Amino acid sequence: MSALATAEPWDLVAVNYAAESLPYLEAFAREALRLAALPPRPRIADIAAGPGTLSLLAAADGARVSAIDLSPRMVDEFRARSGAGGMAGAVDVRVGDGQQLPFETAAYDGAFSMFGLMFFPDRAAGLREMKRVLKPGGRAVVASWIPFDGPFSALFQAASEIVPGLPAGGGFALSDEESIVREMSEAGLANVAVHRVAQELKAPSFDAFWNSMERTNAPLVLLKHRVGAERWQTMGPKIRERVAATLGEGPLTLGRGAFLGIGIA
């Protein structure tokens, strides 16, 4: 099982992830909501919801949202953000397993998993649960990362050598269009289509980029936590050097691509 399928790395990054990564990730969430083309004031299930990136955008536009995440600290961040935004009444968020949803059957217009289901130990179960909770004709949307190389590949390769269960070289499940169509179709979703979406990650310098990664990148933060502060003083600069050799000192503009798979219940 992937280390990223457990609560530990997401608990470790929760506070900084919510503070620093939201503007970048919200762009993918907005596109997912646009492509889903749900009716006005829809009911939405947000699975592996993190700090509420998609949920709170949807709620601000009138949706009623049921959300779940396996990380207690991510759920804490979600609740804090929904309260601060005056949307606590529009969202119900709880800690739980996306492979066994505590949601009623055939009740939702849309079910979303933004960069979460790809880490599930049993993706088929997660997709079947998405299908189960959707009304007939409801939309399931699954986001996953297009394989990346360069600096991110070097980072993941270095991390995977220390922490078993991390993807080596930056490869995740559902990282090609064929597997997305196959797995969503096998779960009973119809007319599955896959869209490519690209966003840019900008940093004023490599130092700024690296410092943010040390706070928000779940594999890197988990690695740092597992090896301990003393070993990290030696290991961290070596990994940084490998990544910097690819990127240079900046300013940086890094393109990241994602797949959005959409199927009909």
Cite the ranges covered by each PLM segment.
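Class I SAM-dependent methyltransferase Rossmann-like catalytic core
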Residues: 14-22
